[in-house]
Amino acid sequence: MSEPSAKKQKFANSLEALKATGTTVVADTGDFESIAKFTPQDATTNPSLILAAAKQQAYAKLIDSAVQYGKKQGQNIDEQVEIAVDKLLVEFGTAILKVVPGRVSTEVDARLSFDKDATVKKALEIIKLYEAEGISKDRVLIKIASTWEGIQAAQELEKEHDIHVNLTLLFSFAQAVAAAEANVTLISPFVGRILDWYKASTGETYTAETDPGVISVKSIYNYYKKHGYNTIVMGASFRNVGEIKALAGVDFLTISPKLLDELLSSDEPVAKILDPESAKAEGSERVSFINDEPKFRFELNEDAMATEKLSEGIRKFSADIVTLFDLIKAKIQA
């Protein structure tokens, strides 16, 4: 049904064709100098992306500025480092917001993933730093891992503080349901990392249509539309453009510069695959997790892929934030 409409209009490239399906394109990078040509609406960052960008000479001034700020504000070395790292994340976000017209996602320290109160506290500190830069909280999404504690923190931030949250490292239907019930602004269901797990565990080869990560996002999208949830579904973590095209029409897609480049240099058509009306007919029946921690934990535990990938993701982001802390600490002590 949507295939012919994709061909009626000729677009300059596949990226423009993707945007024409109704999907909002988001740049997944901390390297803000590389994203303007893609004209994304928003940008997402994480500790790994910031760490990669921080190692580039082009961003040395941001690091120096954050280090000086940390030295002034902190009472001891540990405080100075923590403040400087928060400041650095916000400096990257502020610079990105000069390039994108929408919002930037800034991640809370992944080591707080199992501490609701500490997550809320850190989110408020990050927003305060943005506001000191003249950035309204409406232009910031606080990224939090989709643990039980993270989802509860997100609910509190949205309800009590009117702070927008992006729940990340989302691999399971239970996480997605609880996130919608928490009324969060946006979720980031991961596609490529789900595919990685299934390829490793089954040894099978998947097409874009049979890709377990693509199927996961479709089922979440259909469920949200069927039950009238306003939470934005933003597919994330892609291994190839086939996965991206298979989700054309979904609310948002956050895409790495490498894959954005591929779309920009291709003139292949992109057909709209997902739409709200069809989704309403295909979504599964309503279930609930938000007030039932044992049920949530059991459902997550039953999903080996989601359990392993959530743990692995938190470990990876935690390791990268520690590396970033060490980098900043060395500069403060130099």
From Swiss-Prot:
One of its GO terms (molecular function) is transaldolase activity. The modification N-acetylserine is found at residue 2. InterPro entries: Aldolase_TIM, TAL/FSA, Transaldolase_1, Transaldolase_AS. GO terms for cellular component: cytoplasm. It comes from the Eukaryota. Its EC number is 2.2.1.2. Keywords: Acetylation, Pentose shunt, Schiff base, Transferase. The active site is at residue 143. It is an enzyme of class 2 (transferase). One of its GO terms (biological process) is carbohydrate metabolic process. The keyword Acetylation applies. It catalyses: D-sedoheptulose 7-phosphate + D-glyceraldehyde 3-phosphate = D-erythrose 4-phosphate + beta-D-fructose 6-phosphate. Homodimer. Transaldolase is important for the balance of metabolites in the pentose-phosphate pathway. This is Transaldolase.
